[in-house]
Amino acid sequence: MADNKGRRDTFDVSGDTNTNATSNKRSIEDKIEADLDKIMKKGSFTPADALELYNKYGDENEYLVDKILKMNSKKNLKIRKQARLLAEKIYQRYNNGTKPLHEILEKMLKYKKENKWSDKEYDEFRKELTNLLTGNRALEIDYNQNLTSYKSRINRALGGIKNEEVIRQADSGLRIKDSEKGVLQDILNMYDRTANLHRTVFMHSLMYEDCSLVAITGEFDRKRHLATNYIDPILACMFIPKIDIFEIHMLYANFGSIIKARSERKQITNEPDLLLYYDITSDPNDVVCEINSPIADLRNRYRVQIALWGIVMKLRNGNYYDSEAMDDFSKTLDACRNNLYDNADLAYNNDEGAIMRRLLSVFSLRPTIIVTKPVYSIASFAMGQLMPQLIMGANGVPSPFGQSMNPFNNQPIYTITSIPMITLQIPPITDNAEPIDLRSATTQTLWVNENKTIIPKEQSIIYSKEVLIFYINRRIQRIQLKTFSNPLSFSQLPLTMSSFERLNGYPVHVPDRLVLDRGDEVYNLRSVVSVTETKIGGLSTSLVEGLPSNSILGQNSQSTGIITGRTGLITKPRNFETGVFEPEYYLYDPFGASLPVRHPDQSGYFTNKPISHIPPLYSPSVDLTGGIENPSFFDRASRTGTIFIYAKPQGYNPNQPLSLF
């Protein structure tokens, strides 16, 4: 019998496990995609929609997350293409230099309002326009990637390519040394270990509603919780409210996913990862968590992000006490540093503002776009003072003034840059003080590091991506003359009680609604980080007995305010769709929940909740509260508020395609 050459045997695949699994996977993916298409036809994706999908496909979490991200990426890719067309049109119109960039952006804010663009859409236009600027026009953008002088180590390590090219092609991948391969493997291992955690955080964020009832009704249990091991109020003020830009950059995006894609020379098509990639490669601070190695810097940032994921999950489930989670977060964040680029005069502060700056620097989140110009021409002014005969005025006549009369020497140079937060300086004297309006910080003078020199510059805000973050330094250093004749022993009391650092209670007017002059952008107050003041001194003999005579408590018979901690003030704005007809105000004070409080009628003691309702304006008299001070929401914000977070009610995500004009 002849051999059956070329004959292909057939096999029964009905029992093939791999084939069945593949078929089931495709079937589930098709169902998820069909359900997502139905939802997107409505025009929005709500937490209720996310909850419905999660209940239906909870066991297929990996497929669900992947489909949602792909759906979002397709939509944003279309927006990016439209933004590029518009940017090219504007570039061609104004490339002759007749109009500076900050005036172009201000003009486009009017179109933003008229065409109802979202912050996401406007920001894509700004990115595309700035990427087109070359030559002298590129100097208008601080740290423009088109400048040859821009040498971002993070950018080089990740391949040194632009955001646009990441979408279109896979190139040479990471550019790291052989000695750094071990760090890369650590990052990839961290990604594998935390993949399920990230998917859980992502789905939980989609389902989470602003100031969820679960998040604000947690309890303190003395048998299970240690009151001092509470989650930092700074994180509560960022993540109990739902603010899109924090969700996208810190929860949706994944440092590990970016590194994995670049190491495998694959495209980055995940929209949150693309936004994070753009920010970390265009950040003027460059490395922030490790000076010697950019890939080690990214590993440290990834550690902060992983620790943050765990804390947010606990916080939003009403668990405000976890020493292990906070210890991990604090250790990883402390490895990162403050920078000299933003508010150089505050670079060595170690307070609430420093923590916030470090956290924002980890994610290179710089939402506020500002225009700066020198207060005056320092170089020409100094030259005029030292050698006025060399400063020539009109018609070759030496100028008798300090500055040159040459308009090209003294013409202010406008620069567009981005900052993480806005600093408002307050006076140290609080007696009979007139409140300063927080809005005055939108146009002010600040100190910046330019070419390794700290100089003053006048800044004004062009616009801000969804959030406006203000910072006030509430810690004031006061030295009493009597401490020189009777010095204080630092081994006897904590540093915060050393008489050098106390609360600066200068009043600040805090509006619940803030409108920027350019573009009429509206921001609502969402949360305030407030420092806690403890009154010491003026105590009874029994309490002071045993303390050294040269200590504060031994010296002072008068009450002294000492900063001993911080709390969070959170507001939930009105929302007629969810049945919130008036704003609600909350106090996040997990440590205070452990302290017994005497009942006003002297009938006993009670304890407050970790998160409790607080009146917005009315502060009851101490006579009515049994001698207990209970300031209102805005009283606390005015006197002790240090970080103020405002957000746009419409969020950051795009709602409709970008309109061309």
UniProtKB/Swiss-Prot annotation:
Residues of the signal peptide: none
Keywords from the UniProt entry: Coiled coil, Virion
Stretches with biased composition (Basic and acidic residues): 1-11
Compositionally biased tracts (Polar residues): 15-25
Location(s) in or outside the cell: Virion
Protein name: Putative core protein L410
GO cellular component: virion component
Organism: Acanthamoeba polyphaga mimivirus (APMV)
Highest taxon listed in the record's lineage: Viruses
Region of interest (Disordered), ranges: 1-26
Residue ranges that the Swiss-Prot or TrEMBL entry lists as coiled coil: 112-140
Main location: virion
